[in-house]
Amino acid sequence: PGFYAIMMYRLAHELYLHDVPLLPRIITEIAHAKTGIDIHPGANIGHHFFIDHGTGVVIGETTSIGNHVRIYQGVTLGALSLNDAHKLKNKKRHPTIKDNVIIYANASILGGDTVIGNNVVIGGNVFIYSSIEDNKMVVFEKENYKIKDRKGG
């Protein structure tokens, strides 16, 4: 599924770059329906990009991904939810992932100012909304989760 989704994205991206209306998004939505992988045709993705077990992968429109990047199921490269999100139209809203990065299952990396450096490994179930320097590893430690009362529930 990952190969198919990437192949369809590459075709859609070229059409997107040539300002072809609607068709690029239709192509990526067909790929999404067949694979469970949602890559916006506006995303910029380098060479040697690999998606393994891709169900639930979401890559937003202004995401930039470098070369030799590998991601696993459930990864979201998305925008932060903001009250004034409409003000960010035509601006960088999604993260930048540099070269030689591995992002494991169910990690969420959010925000246009978020940059993941070269040679970084992002562990599973990690939620990131700030930049990570080159040559780092980010992991979720179960001792650090919090349980809070729900408001109104």
Model-derived regions: residue spans:
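Glycine-rich hexapeptide-repeat left-handed beta-helix
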Residues: N67-G153
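Short beta-turn/strand-loop junction motif enriched in small, turn-promoting residues
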Residues: T55-G56, S108
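Alpha-helical transmembrane segments of helical membrane proteins, especially in multi-pass transport
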Residues: V58, T62-S64, H68-R70
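Glycine-rich phosphate-binding loop
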Residues: I51-H53, I59
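Short, conserved active-site entrance elements at the starts or edges of catalytic domains
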Residues: L17-H47
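Terminal amphipathic alpha-helical/low-complexity segments used for targeting or macromolecular assembly
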Residues: P1-E29, K151-G153
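A generic structural motif
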Residues: G46, G54, S64-G66, E133
